[in-house]
Amino acid sequence: MRHAVVLLSGGLDSAVTLALCKRDGFEPHALSFEYGQRHAIEIAAAQRVAASMHVQDHRIATIDLRVFGGSALTDEAIEVPRRHSERSGAESRNPVEAATRAATGSLDFARDDGIPVTYVPARNTIFLSYALAFAEVIGASDIFIGVNAVDYSGYPDCRPEFLAAFQQLAGLATKAGVQGKRMMIRAPLLALSKAEIVREGVKLGVDFALTHSCYAPAEDRAACGCCDSCQLRLAGFREAGVKDPIRYV
C-alpha cells in the first residue's frame, strides 16, 4: 500500500482531505500542529477525526509561531474579527445571515493590503516543510493538504501558484527528488466550493460533528458563528442543503 502524509487541522477541509486520501487507497499518516494558536480545541478535533477514520499514525508537532505574532490566531493583541462587533442586535448573532454575507463575498476582515488578519505568515510553507520531512522518513511520496482556492479567506498560501512552487521545491530539496522519485503535493479540494466539499464529505461518511472551524469559540467550545471561518463553513452547509451538526453560540 502507498503511504501518504496528510496535514490534519481538525477542520472541515482537512477531514474531507483525509477521507479522500483513504478512498484513493493510501495509508494515511496524519500530521497536526500545536503552533501557538489561540485554542487547543483544534488539536482535540484533529485527534477525534483521526480516530474516527482509524488512522494508525497521527503525529502532533509542537512549534511556536507566537514568537513572530503577526496574526489574530497567534497574537493576543490582534482581535479575531467578528461580524457582531460591527453590527448590533439579533442580526449580528444570526450565523445563517452571516453565512449569506460570506457567500456573497462581503467579507472585509482584511489589512490594508487585502490579506485577512487571520492569515498566519508562512504557515502552510512551514507545515508543508514538516510534512516533507515526515514523508522522507517514512518513505511516502505523497502529501495531502486541504487548501481551497474557491471559497476561502484570501490567504496567499492557499493558491495554486504556491502549491506549484512548493511542488518544485520538493523535487529539488529532498533525497527522493535527487534520486528521481517524484514527491507529489496533492490538494484535492483546491478547485471545489465549500458546498462541494461538504457534499463530498457526506458521500465519504465524514462525521462533521467531530470537526472544528471557529477562530473564536466560546468557553464551552461552541462556535461563534460570526468569524470568517464560521461564515464560510455555514455558507457551505447551507448551499449544500446539509445541516451543520456542530454547536453555535
Task: For each feature predicted by the language model, list its residue ranges.
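Iron-sulfur (Fe-S) cluster-binding segments and ferredoxin-like electron-carrier domains
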Residues: 154, 222-223, 228-249
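Residue-level signal for alpha-helical context at structural boundaries
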Residues: 180, 184, 219, 245-248
